[in-house]
């Protein structure tokens, strides 16, 4: 498998942690990492990471199926899982699992990865990515208020 896939889901905060994990995975494994954004297809939530200059590509349906071994019959997937050859990570929420950033047969990662140790090595890059540009200054026009802007309440 020449790539890894990280599921992006939840609100903006969760998406930011998942993206930071994906970037860290890319750096640690020197492997292409794709983002699975299919969660948003049937959700009221929106993919909000696009507010930032993210640079990881989105995974196609075929790439997701390959990463999750969905191209194999369910019986074969279940047998491989029982033998320890599962390629989908367990859901990770708050705990830190350093083995996830090491080479393994895992190809699909889902969870929230809400521990900064996942991206300590690339912290400056993550901070730069998620720093919003300064707001544009609003230039106030000085001058006379046009007569049509007044309303006479005395009538």
Predicted regions and their residues:
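Extreme N-terminal starter segment of soluble prokaryotic enzymes
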Residues: 1-5
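A short, glycine/small-residue-rich beta-strand->loop->alpha-helix junction that serves as a flexible
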Residues: 7-17
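Short catalytic/ligand-binding loop motif for oxyanion handling, primarily in non-cytosolic enzymes
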Residues: 13-15, 42-46
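Histidine-anchored nucleotide/phosphate-binding helix
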Residues: 15-27
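A short beta-strand-loop structural module common to alpha/beta enzyme folds
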Residues: 31-42
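Secretory-pathway luminal glycosyltransferase catalytic domains
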Residues: 46-155
